């Protein structure tokens, strides 16, 4: 369905996640609105409701390279993340349930850093995630308000993107598992470090950790979440 207004254009998409699909109970009715504003923002609004108790944490896995083809990787991009904590992983790449400080770790992007040196100079730390970031940050928005989660800047094009969300988690992924087998615009292959993802979400594996914000959804509730990519 098309969305049209004075300063907004977009599209509304609906999907019914049927009872038992992938093992999850309940019919989960999901609506996602994608809106482009006159302020150069892409606004993504999620809503969902269910007819039986289930789990729900929706996100977006868009890849961003702000160079517009000038660079095949994001290693020269500069990134800042507005979080002081993260959820560490075990050797099997699963959350441990801990919430640790990013201070004195390679995940500390509280001040802008160039991604290339930040990743390549910390190979041992990022070995578990195939040589790059694939980590979840814990954002300071316990009251559900929109906060600035991250910023990305490309020095070649001068483009800047800010990420805002009302969700408690931000998964940052630097395309460590891309291997060139997928091609994009103009037939160019997507190789390792081709782009970066900012996946706003609930904390990973929250169903197994009671101290994480709940991802349970009940029939009398409406799930809602908002993410903004501002340019």
Region spans (language model):
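An exposed, glycine/acidic-rich loop-and-rim segment of catalytic or binding clefts
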Residues: 1-231
């Amino acid at each position: 369905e098309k969305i049209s207004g004075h300063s907004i254009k977009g599209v509304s998409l609906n999907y019914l996640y049927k009872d038992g699909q992938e093992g999850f109970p309940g019919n989960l009715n999901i609506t996602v609105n994608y809106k482009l504003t006159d302020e150069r923002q892409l606004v993504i609004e999620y809503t969902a409701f269910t007819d039986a108790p289930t789990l729900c944490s929706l996100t977006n896995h868009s890849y961003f390279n702000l160079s517009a083809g000038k660079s095949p990787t994001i290693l020269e991009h500069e990134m800042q993340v507005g979080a002081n904590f993260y959820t560490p992983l075990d050797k099997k790449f699963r959350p441990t349930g801990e919430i640790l400080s990013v201070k004195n770790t390679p995940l500390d992007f509280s001040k802008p850093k160039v991604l290339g040196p930040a990743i390549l100079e910390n190979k041992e730390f990022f070995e578990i995630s195939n040589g790059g970031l694939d980590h979840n940050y814990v954002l300071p928005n316990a009251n559900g308000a929109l906060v600035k989660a991250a910023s990305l800047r490309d020095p070649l094009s001068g483009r800047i993107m800010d990420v805002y969300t009302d969700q408690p988690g931000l998964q940052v992924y630097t395309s460590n598992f891309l291997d060139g087998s997928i091609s994009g615009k103009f037939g160019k292959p997507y190789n390792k470090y081709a782009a970066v993802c900012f996946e706003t979400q609930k904390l990973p594996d929250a169903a197994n950790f009671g101290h994480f914000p709940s991802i349970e959804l009940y029939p009398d509730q409406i799930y809602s979440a908002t993410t903004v990519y501002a340019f």
